[in-house]
């Protein structure tokens, strides 16, 4: 009986490890959750490492690493909370899952765009335009800086 109980306890511990979430923030609009690369659909954040280059912004003639800033803003928001994602489309051209992800029921995409640390990706979605307009009107995040849109940065890099 004790042996059976020991096996059962070990089995339960193994199950918990098997279902534990592993999360790594890749950049301001991409995470790796349980080994799956997930790209936040409908938004675009500054690049922290695109072909070996990091996107920068200017504020009062000071260079700001806005790619890293966006990533850090996302890391801080997630903290130790559980991230859940709702798949929206087929994987993109880079084989990333496209999804909207949430922490405590709050959209991380909306949080990033409304805070000025990502942009509504109008080419693919109209969902976050109002949030971008709010950030722009209030000069939040990158809207307080001189910046290049991420899609333009990628074209010139």
Residue ranges, per PLM feature:
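Small beta-barrel nucleic-acid-binding modules, primarily SNase/OB-fold domains
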Residues: 4-157
